[in-house]
Amino acid sequence: MIEALKKKFNDKIAIVTGRGFNAISSSLKEILNQFNVENSVFLEDESRDLAKPNPQSLIRAMKGLDSKNCLYVGDSMEDMILAQKASELGFKATFCGIYGSGKLPDMRKKLFVKYDVPLILETINQLPDILMIKKT
């Protein structure tokens, strides 16, 4: 899936996560190398004032990728607010809400619907189909 996304978005794939680099490295292992790590942001390793929903982490990643717009995939209301705030500051971030991960998926889905999230998916594995990307 990552290879297909990289092809679709000209290798401009980065991560903005609340977790730290070591935690992400441990869970993603070799997959992490598929992302532009240099322009990714690992908020656990940053100062607390950058915590979600502060949009500066996403804006920094977008600037590093030389991008004026992005698709931001997340599973929380903080992620949704972060994307909205980035857009308000001139960095168009289309939010894709993932509701099937974690606790209370039905409640999360209802909140995403209530706040007119443009893309709402049960799992990130549905993303290539929604974006009409051929999986490799």
Go through each PLM region and give its residues.
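Short amphipathic alpha-helical segments and helix-helix/interface helices
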Residues: 1-7, 58, 62, 109
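Short, acidic/turn-prone active-site loops that include or flank metal/cofactor-
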Residues: 41-49, 98-104, 126
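Acidic, Mg2+-coordinating phosphoryl-transfer loop and its flanking beta/alpha structural elements
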Residues: 72-119
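Substrate-recognition "cap/lid" segment bordering the active-site pocket of phosphatases
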Residues: 14, 18-71, 77-88
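Short acidic-hydrophobic, aromatic-tinged amphipathic segments that line or gate anion-handling sites
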Residues: 118-127
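Short amphipathic alpha-helix with an adjacent loop that forms part of the alpha/beta core around
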Residues: 127-136
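Alpha-helix termini
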Residues: 5-9, 32-33, 84-94, 135
